[in-house]
């Protein structure tokens, strides 16, 4: 905030010169030539992980212990703390999803979060669920760029002011404009997700006039893209920092891309970051940019010194929350803590336990067996055809008696390991409660549809998994299309399935809901998958292995 300091100092000097000998109230509450310590702790993309995983990693009870210890340490040294979240509290773990993330928001309140950004997955549910979640949270949910289409007014709080030892800090919230296509179209039709860069610039100008903050931070859910190279994604944190005037924004606490933002060099992200590795945040146009991967695996810690209006980052760390690694002991593989074990906070653990037990009662029932892994990892399924993507598509195709099936990879949220399969596994893979839809189209319409959907790029949730169809994709077009082993005929009619999210235009797919051949079956995707697994158990994963049906050139 160097520019503000210069203006403020010049103004103060002018007043002093004019009113020589008269006592003047300083414009700032902090003392000159005094060094203040400020620490920002942060997480993002929680996605329902209020409970530790089956290996004893992360979880909110251990996170609270860590944050309480950090707070005590920092305050003992005369420092102040802000605890921020980059959003996406919703969607990902069945025990949370079935309870509208109540344990997660109430857990965050007990941990003591100061503010969060609204993420795109906050809009997976009807708005009345989000309003209920606002009541469960004792901290503000921020977004300056979400507007009501009818009234033209902001729907959520745009910023929150904090006073830390006389330092006035404005925290603004911003949400990716991609929410318009990533959120559930059934629930966001009346919402306008405006350009967060423009809204940030406008809001910062207003804040300078009204609140006159010493520092401006942003909690964002926009994504961090190396050197701003975002592909088909909406502009992220790098683009935001570059768009603003240098010095206007001191720090971005981000989310959405679900990665550790650790840099090897300017504009070069450190590849293969591992727990306990050193992490240097990105810095763009005078703005620090941080992100703490996902799921509460880490708590980010940014230590600053503030002196005479200037902010300087002293150190940064991503602290693992009970993450483990595999080691060989006596010829057997076992998992050990990477750093010292963090004990779970007893009070929070007991508060969360009934939620966990209630969820597990419904989920831990075996429904099938599989003889191998069904691959749904986002780093695989968003880049290539996988056996799990194929299996889900086949389950939809069979239920709808369709000729082929289209399944967006963003709707495949996890893998299924070999062995017993439970309902929880199914809901972890498909947590969004999308409805199975199908559409009857002519071959010509199908070809036009595939030219949009099959050409979606890798590394995005729009990348499509297929069943019952083969084709070649090259130069933004499809060719050599075969359905059910027979070449596509433009004058024939075909039936294909697609999740309701995509049928409504999600992921930038062509909207089908107004097509005369469109049918909403009413079948929930997870239930369709569950019944398919039960019916075909034991599952032979080799039957669903891709075999070159979709060729990319």
UniProtKB/Swiss-Prot annotation:
The record marks 121, 124 as: Transition state stabilizer. Substrate binds at residues 432, 501-507. Its EC number is 3.1.3.5. Chloride. GO terms for cellular component: cell outer membrane; outer membrane-bounded periplasmic space. A lipid is attached at residue 22 (S-diacylglycerol cysteine). It is found in: Cell outer membrane. It is a lipid-anchor. It catalyses: a ribonucleoside 5'-phosphate + H2O = a ribonucleoside + phosphate. Keywords: Cell outer membrane, Hydrolase, Lipoprotein, Magnesium, Membrane, Metal-binding, Nucleotide-binding, Palmitate, Signal. Belongs to the 5'-nucleotidase family. This is 5'-nucleotidase. It comes from Vibrio vulnificus (strain CMCP6). The gene is nutA.
